[in-house]
């Protein structure tokens, strides 16, 4: 496996909690927009927002990879963008890594109500190549793309 490190942040190690999930079977395109939307939010606010998107009460704005994304009327005006979607599979994976980071924070003795998402990012993971049989003895390559999600929570006063 390739070497990998968390980004270096100028914060006290006793005030942060980290979590990572690797080789998630999810597209980097959806994860990028989910991570961008919740970066800098309080942990509880981010989880509430993601649950509202899962219930399709609010759309997630798509800044990048938004070709074909229609304008949604239930996007908040604070995003200053109209294109949005409901990437449910990506949100479930991000909620999973947020729960893991929250458990790490409580294990460290940090106050959960004061946690903000200091860093969250999705990176490309491994790509699995498979073959789909076709007519006349041919085969077509199929690619299964994966992603890695990393999160750092910081306790603020």
UniProtKB/Swiss-Prot annotation:
Question: Where in the chain are disulfide-linked cysteines found?
Answer: none
On whether Acetylation is a keyword of this UniProt record, the answer is no
Q: Which GO molecular function annotations are given, in alphabetical order?
A: rRNA binding; structural constituent of ribosome
Q: Name the GO terms of the biological process aspect.
A: cytoplasmic translation
- Gene Ontology cellular component terms for the protein in this record: cytosolic large ribosomal subunit
Asked if rRNA-binding is a keyword of the record, the answer is yes
Q: Which UniProt keywords apply?
A: Ribonucleoprotein, Ribosomal protein, RNA-binding, rRNA-binding
What Pfam families does the annotation carry? Ribosomal_L22 (PF00237)
Subunit details = Part of the 50S ribosomal subunit.
- Report the HAMAP family cross-referenced here: Ribosomal_uL22_A
Q: What does this protein do?
A: This protein binds specifically to 23S rRNA. It makes multiple contacts with different domains of the 23S rRNA in the assembled 50S subunit and ribosome. The globular domain of the protein is located near the polypeptide exit tunnel on the outside of the subunit, while an extended beta-hairpin is found that lines the wall of the exit tunnel in the center of the 70S ribosome.
Q: Which family does it belong to?
A: Belongs to the universal ribosomal protein uL22 family.
Query: Which protein is depicted?
Result: Large ribosomal subunit protein uL22
Organism the protein comes from? Saccharolobus solfataricus (strain ATCC 35092 / DSM 1617 / JCM 11322 / P2) (Sulfolobus solfataricus)
């Amino acid at each position: 496996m390739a070497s990998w490190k968390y980004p270096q942040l100028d914060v006290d190690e006793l005030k942060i909690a980290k979590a990572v999930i690797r080789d998630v079977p999810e597209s980097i395109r959806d994860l990028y927009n989910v991570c961008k939307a919740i970066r800098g939010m309080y942990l509880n606010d981010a989880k509430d927002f993601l649950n509202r998107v899962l219930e399709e009460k609010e759309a997630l704005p798509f800044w990048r990879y938004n070709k074909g994304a229609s304008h949604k009327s239930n996007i908040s005006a604070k995003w200053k963008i109209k294109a949005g979607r409901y990437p449910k599979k990506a949100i479930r994976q991000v909620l999973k890594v947020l729960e893991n980071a929250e458990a790490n924070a409580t294990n460290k003795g940090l106050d959960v109500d004061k946690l903000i998402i200091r860093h969250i990012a999705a990176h490309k993971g491994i790509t699995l190549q498979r073959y789909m049989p076709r007519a006349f003895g041919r085969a077509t390559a199929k690619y299964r793309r994966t992603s890695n999600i990393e999160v750092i929570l910081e306790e603020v006063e």
